[in-house]
Amino acid sequence: MGRLVFNYRKAMREPKKIQQLTENYSLPFAVELIPAINYFIFVGLCFGFWYGVRMIFPHAFDNSYVIVIFGIPFFLTMLVTKIKPEGKNIYIYFFDFAKYYFFIKLPQKKYCNDRKIDLSNEKQIEFRKLVKVVDYSNETKNAYEGNTQEFAVNKNGRRVGVLPNKKQFDSYAK
């Protein structure tokens, strides 16, 4: 008997649907939840816009309530359902875009290899002068000897190999 591999991706990505409204009443067909929520949000927005226009111009759009309540929200719901920028839901896309804009673009943060660069906004970056490092105590003399690593600080807390009485080492010297 061979091994059966099941792919549940299609079943898990099935949108949530509403059919049973109350215990005694159910719809004859299922309605997807997200487009239904979008529709009622767009009905509220269109009705508010229509009401504002009617307050300013009382005789404008006398018999257009059918278009405002059913037509425009239905069109906007279908449009929002079809548009998938970068393969994402449009609301998730706008949320991610707002997060990027307010947390990265406006503060002018810069990243390199997913790490924040702290000194990218500095006008002038100063480097410390180089010093000549000398430590011949555990020098490897033969190829068969091991190269044991030492700490950069000795027991007294001083840096090993830096000669403070010597002058600065110039890396650009010829």
Swiss-Prot record:
Major localisation: membrane
Keyword Cell membrane among record annotations: yes
Listed transmembrane segments: 29-51, 66-83
Keywords, in A-Z order: Cell membrane, Membrane, Transmembrane, Transmembrane helix
GO cellular component: plasma membrane
Membrane topology (UniProt): Multi-pass membrane protein
A Pfam family recorded for this sequence: TcpE
Keyword Cell membrane: yes
Subcellular location: Cell membrane
Protein name from the UniProt record: Uncharacterized protein YddD
Species of origin: Bacillus subtilis (strain 168)
